[in-house]
């Protein structure tokens, strides 16, 4: 469902009242954090800043049905294999970025029969946290997956953390790439869809 700017402002304000951080709201709405900040600080009466160029990506139709997540993950897995020159032995672990990359990571790892790990990004916690309940990344060759790449900061942060932990990051993979980037931190970036603002 398309939301007007006023509807987005109300939705952002509601999420803020519920205690979500700017980062969490951005993840929930698939918008950049700068857009969320603009929606919070610029009302109709106080529209001092120019509206940021952003595109809202809604993929609830996919996320609500596991069979659809599996179908898209099959495409993700094919892209991973293509990048690995069709040799899955070159890969140890799929890392999903919490929260929206988890479903895809789990399904891709299942299809490729490799480990799955979960990274929770956090601005104030030295780059985030790799969950100890899942696969680990030290000394492993990994692919990182998320839903939407808005600015690249979350992916860049995750790659940096994984490399510090001793992982060799082979590929960054997203459902939608909202940037012109083809690599992040020297890691190839592939998006199933790329958006371009004209």
Model-identified regions with their sequence ranges:
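PRPP-associated nucleotide enzymes
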Residues: 1-145, 151-198
């Amino acid at each position: 469902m398309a939301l007007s700017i006023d509807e987005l402002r109300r939705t952002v304000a509601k999420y803020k009242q519920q205690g979500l951080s700017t980062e969490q709201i951005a993840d929930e709405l698939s918008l950049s954090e700068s857009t969320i900040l603009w929606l919070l600080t610029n009302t109709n009466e106080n529209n001092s800043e120019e509206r940021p160029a952003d595109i809202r990506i809604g993929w609830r139709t996919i996320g609500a049905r596991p069979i659809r997540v599996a179908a898209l993950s099959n495409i993700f897995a094919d892209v991973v294999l293509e990048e690995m020159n069709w040799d899955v032995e070159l890969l140890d672990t799929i890392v999903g970025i919490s929260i929206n990359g988890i479903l895809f990571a789990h399904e891709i790892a299942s299809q490729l029969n490799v480990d799955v790990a979960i990274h929770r990004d956090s601005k104030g916690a030295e780059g985030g946290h790799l969950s100890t309940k899942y696969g680990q990344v030290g000394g492993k060759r990994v692919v990182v997956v998320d839903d939407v790449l808005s600015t690249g900061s979350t992916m860049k942060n995750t790659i940096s953390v994984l490399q510090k932990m001793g992982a060799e990051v082979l590929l960054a993979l997203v459902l939608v790439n909202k940037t012109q980037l083809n690599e992040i931190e020297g890691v190839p970036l592939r998006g199933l869809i790329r958006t371009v603002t004209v």
